[in-house]
Amino acid sequence: MEWNELSKKEKQSFSEADMCRISITPSIHSAYWASLTHLREHYYFTDGNIEVNGNKTKRGKAKKADYVLFHKPNIPLAIVEAKDNTHSIGDGMQQALDYAEILDVPFAYSSNGDAFIEHDRTGKGDIIEKEISLDKFPTPEILWDRYKTHKGYNEEQENIVTYDYYDDGSGRSPRYYQVNAINRTIDAIAKLSLIHI
């Protein structure tokens, strides 16, 4: 039986993890977000704040997005937050927007398995938030084109910003705030290249 054939009561009996497995993940995969370079599930991007209480320290709760969609490993495009079906479609939006702000991501999505709500943080479109059916989730190409339009990149600038980061072979990758700083620097260089040509 397909997700859309289930009754509301049946849908609400599933946990968030089940609903992701049955509905949200297949919808994202069907939009060609299948490769590990484009899609990361349960994406931890902080270790949690260090909390000091007298002589004892412990870590607070780590921040974890349900899904982060990437153009390339260090160019995040979208956050998708899932809630179980007892919630409305948009109930995860505030969390998605908070994470999108932290990760400097232009697109935020929320879903309860019935559809998606998209929030466009670019300010370029006429509609900031809209509902998208499960079978109409945007492809990597569509979101990348919207991102390039938002940034105003020409082909040369796109080549600059998509150039791979240096890899020293250690297996370590930059933290989210380092990725943000690197990407902002590369973006500024790409925009300056247009002036000096």
How does the language model describe each region?
Residues 1-195:
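ATP-dependent helicase/translocase motor core
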